């Protein structure tokens, strides 16, 4: 089966681009450049998607063929839940990106933004039988908040969507076993901070394990970390993402084009 989604472009004639879509495009393009800056890119693969406000269940996804460093607001593809491109573009949609992301956008009303990565330490933890350890600063914050989904290949079969959403439930941090990491949120900022925390937990876990025996945290300390972490607090999420966006603006603001 091809990794290119075989749907015909069905551009909506005279489809207006309102302010909400313009804002979403800039924000999502910024996220792609932030991922590139952090080294979370993977050639032309992996995806970040963002639902465009409105009743139509349309969302933006990266053009399959562009590196994250090349993505701009205007180059993003607008597609529906069937994977149809709603604006003219020479770029196709990646099938796996559509399957994984549309599953969450369709089933989880709060999943406005979905992010997926194949970082080295993220994939390493995804390959471990016991998964994410709670015995570090970041892992403790996520205790009880991480969902797991078993490996089913490259995620190109539509039938996987139901199993994926069932396994994820309402947990915003996800480990795709033997595959990679995934996070979602009410907006780009929440999804980003969730994924960043999960990524840091994986980084520390792999680094600590390579150095020797890990000093375990007590259940009480882990529970306290969960209570005090403020995971998902809107102001924190917004401030973090705004700071990262300023860094990207200072490096190369062309993503806004």
Q: PLM ranges: what are they?
A:
Residues 1-257:
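Glycine-rich flexible loops
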């Amino acid at each position: 089966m091809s990794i290119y989604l075989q749907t015909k472009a069905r551009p909506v004639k005279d489809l207006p681009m309102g302010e909400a879509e313009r804002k979403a495009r800039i924000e999502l393009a910024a996220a792609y450049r932030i991922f590139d800056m952090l080294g979370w890119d993977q050639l032309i693969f992996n995806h970040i998607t963002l639902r465009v406000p409105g009743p139509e269940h349309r969302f933006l996804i990266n053009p399959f063929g562009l590196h994250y460093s090349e993505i701009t607001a205007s180059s993003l593809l607008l597609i529906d839940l069937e994977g149809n491109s709603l604006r003219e573009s020479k770029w196709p949609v990646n099938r796996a990106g559509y399957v994984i992301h549309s599953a969450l956008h369709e089933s989880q009303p709060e999943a406005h933004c979905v992010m997926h990565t194949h970082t080295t330490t993220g994939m390493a933890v995804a390959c471990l039988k016991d998964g994410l350890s709670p015995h570090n600063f970041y892992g403790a914050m996520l205790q009880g908040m991480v969902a797991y989904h078993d490996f089913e290949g490259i995620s190109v079969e539509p039938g996987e969507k139901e199993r994926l959403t069932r396994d994820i439930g309402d947990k915003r941090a996800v480990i795709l076993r033997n595959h990679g990491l995934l996070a979602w949120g009410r907006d780009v900022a929440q999804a980003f901070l969730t994924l960043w925390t999960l990524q840091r937990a994986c980084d520390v876990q792999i680094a600590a394990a390579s150095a020797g025996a890990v000093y375990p945290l007590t259940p009480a300390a882990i529970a306290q970390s969960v209570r005090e972490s403020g995971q998902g607090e809107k102001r924190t999420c917004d401030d973090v993402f705004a700071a990262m966006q300023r860094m990207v603006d200072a490096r190369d603001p062309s993503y806004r084009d």
